[in-house]
Each structure stands twice: as C-alpha cells, then as structure tokens.
C-alpha cells in the first residue's frame, strides 16, 4: 500500500558542457519522486530542464503540478495504472505525470518482486549503446570527441546540429571515421521546411536518420520534408502520446520514432507507442534526457523491448557524470546490461543521496 510521496531535490555537474540548438547544459537540477509503501519504496526521476526550451515543461513547473494536482489524486491503493487513468483529465504536463508514474511503478514492482524489464516484456539482457555528441567549438574538437567515444566502444554516434553548423560537421566525421560507423543527426527543431534543399545535402552521407528537423507542431512540414529527402525522418518532440505517434505515422511525417518515456507521460504510454510501431514495422529507439542512474535504469528496461531495433542514447554513466547517484552503468563491448532485479533494479547510493534534500512529504489518504 502507498503511504506517502516525497520530493527530493539536488543537483549534479556534467563532466563536460552539452550544447544543442537550444542551449548549453553544464549541470542538471534534479527532482526525484519517492513513493513510500509499507515494505518498499519506489523512485522516479523528472527529466524536465530548468528552463522551458526543450519543451513547455520546466522543473519548478513540475514541482507545482505534482504537489498541487497529481499527489492529491493518490490513494493508499493507487497503482501506476490507476494513476494514469486518474491523471488523464489534466492536459499535458507529461514529464510531471511520468515522474509520479515511474515512482509508483517501481514501488509496485518491488512489492510484486518483478523487474521493470520483465513487466514491460523485454527480450534482451543488454542493449547497444549510442552516444549523443553536443555541438563543439570547432571541427578539431568534434573529431577528437567522436574518436574518444568510438574508442570507448559506442556503436552509434549522434551529432547535434543547427543552421550554420550541420553539413560540414557530418562531412568531417564521415571523412575521418568512414562510412562504416552508424551516424545520425539531431536538429532539435532548429530548421523550417524552407530548409529542405539544404537538408537534402545530408543524403550523401548515408545517415541512419535526421531527428526532429522541424518545429514539434509542424507535422505538415515534416510530411513535405520526408518527401523531398532520402534520409529517414525521425520524430522526437512531436511525439507526446500514442495518439500523436499514430497521427504522425498515418500522415507519413516520419519513418522512425524516438520514444522518451518522460516526454510521453511515462513507461506505460511508451510501451503502447512501442507496440504500435512494432505492429507497423516502424523502428524505434530510446532517447535520453541527461538522466542519472534512476532514469537510466528504467530506460534500459524499456529499450530491451523487441521493437527497439536502433541503438539509443543510453550511454554509460561516465558519459555525463563523474559520479552517478546510483552505482554506475558501464559500457561493455558496445552494450549496457539491463537491470534484472526487482523494480528498476537500482537505488540511490546513500552517500550521494546525502547531497540531496527532501523538500516535501505528502501523506496519502487511506481509502
């Protein structure tokens, strides 16, 4: 039975700045939801940033939504499934919902002595690990960084791009490392459909895909772009639910989908999107949001499902953090092992949690 919900706040430094088309991150402000039960606790990580630049959600907004609207819905017998149904009338706020759902799911699976991977239907014990490379200061730095990641064993490289920093980046990486490496690009919605002729130059480089080239609400633009270029179009920010995924596929706005649980409201919805894509033969992969070990563990369970046929952004902990909040995930022969113990399979290290503060405790009403 659920007894209380706690909010935990803290921060963690990144080992190096991570620059995208919408800004540069040097650290992460963190929000964890801790679901307290009779015998176990569950943890969920919020993926929202401190500013509403990736999406309209941001960390302080999530704190308020969780505290004012989501927690009061909970009862002692609440489950992740019942919470999703109860929270449905609240529009949007997917990252807030996903944060609470993850904690509830971790708790109930620990009570049931089932791993998240088994619950979701995973059929892999390890997943291929890709790495996301932020925009660098110059091409020499880019070549150095990509070379270091390939030496560490990453099986796929994703380059962040933006107008004025795109074609030459890809050309340089292909020239330096050859056509054999798996390579894709991510625009984070930095272009418009008027850039189609420019983006068509990417066709020469045999990319796996171009991720979210246009604004998230421009499905018509993505349809037109997909008709004009040969590089497969993958949607990220545009996909916020099963319905938006179905709509994008019906319109042929994309041929690949990046599934991020935090962006779609949680792991239950992410599983539905996976199942839809699997039924249609559409490849999916699991994106990253600079998660610590709490979110990374859960993402590994999701990425172990059969439809995840492309390497995702689930990198080793050391890619982002000198020391993670949980025991670190490591890359071995290009893969990361999927946790197979109960729940998400990891817990915060006590010495790391000591740097965090429990900022709120909400007792859950009895039925």
Segments predicted by a language model, with ranges:
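A short glycine-rich beta-strand->turn/loop micro-motif centered on a GG-aromatic cluster
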Residues: 69-70, 213-214, 286
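Residue-level marker of alpha-helix boundaries and capping positions
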Residues: 95-96, 136, 212-213, 264, ...
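Long, low-complexity, intrinsically disordered polar/charged segments
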Residues: 121-130, 174, 200-210, 245-263
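Acidic-residue sensor for enzyme active/binding pockets
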Residues: 45, 101, 211, 237, ...
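N-terminal capping/lid subdomain adjacent to the active-site entrance of alpha/beta enzymes
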Residues: 1-184, 188-193, 197, 201-204, ...
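Shared catalytic-loop signature of beta/alpha-barrel
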Residues: 217-234, 239-335
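Catalytic beta/alpha-barrel core
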Residues: 156-163, 184-189, 206-216, 232-240, ...
């Amino acid at each position: 039975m659920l007894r209380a919900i706690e909010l935990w706040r803290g921060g963690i430094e990144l080992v190096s700045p991570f620059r995208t088309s919408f800004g540069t991150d040097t650290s992460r402000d963190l929000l964890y939801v801790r679901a307290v039960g009779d015998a176990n606790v569950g943890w969920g990580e919020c993926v929202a940033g401190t500013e509403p630049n990736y999406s309209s959600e941001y960390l302080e907004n999530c704190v308020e939504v969780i505290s004012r609207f989501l927690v009061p819905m909970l009862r002692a017998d609440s489950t992740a499934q019942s919470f999703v149904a109860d929270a449905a009338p609240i529009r949007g706020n997917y990252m807030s919902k996903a944060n609470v759902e993850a904690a509830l799911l971790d708790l109930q699976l620990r009570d049931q002595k089932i791993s998240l991977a088994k619950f979701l239907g995973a059929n892999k014990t390890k997943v291929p690990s890709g790495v996301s490379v932020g925009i660098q200061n110059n091409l020499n730095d880019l070549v150095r960084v990509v070379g270091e990641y390939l030496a560490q064993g990453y099986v796929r490289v994703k380059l962040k791009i933006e107008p004025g920093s795109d074609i030459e980046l890809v050309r340089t990486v292909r020239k330096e490392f050859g056509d054999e490496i798996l390579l894709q690009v991510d625009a984070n919605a930095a272009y418009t459909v008027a850039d189609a002729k420019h983006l068509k130059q990417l066709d020469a480089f045999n990319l796996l895909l171009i991720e979210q080239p246009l604004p998230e609400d421009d499905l018509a633009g993505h349809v037109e772009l997909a008709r004009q270029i040969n590089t497969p179009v993958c949607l990220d920010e545009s996909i916020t639910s099963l319905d938006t995924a179905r709509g994008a596929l019906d319109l042929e706005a994309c041929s690949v989908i990046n599934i991020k649980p935090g962006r779609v409201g949680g792991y239950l919805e992410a599983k539905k999107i996976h199942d839809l894509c699997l039924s249609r033969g559409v490849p999916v992969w699991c994106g990253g949001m600079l998660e610590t070990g709490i979110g990374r563990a859960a993402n590994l369970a999701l990425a172990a499902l059969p439809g995840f046929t492309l390497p995702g952004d689930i990198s080793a902990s050391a890619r982002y953090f000198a020391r993670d909040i949980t025991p670190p995930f490591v890359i071995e022969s290009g893969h990361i092992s999927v946790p197979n113990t109960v729940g998400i399979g990891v817990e915060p290290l006590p010495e790391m949690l000591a740097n965090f503060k429990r900022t709120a405790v909400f007792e859950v009403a009895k039925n």
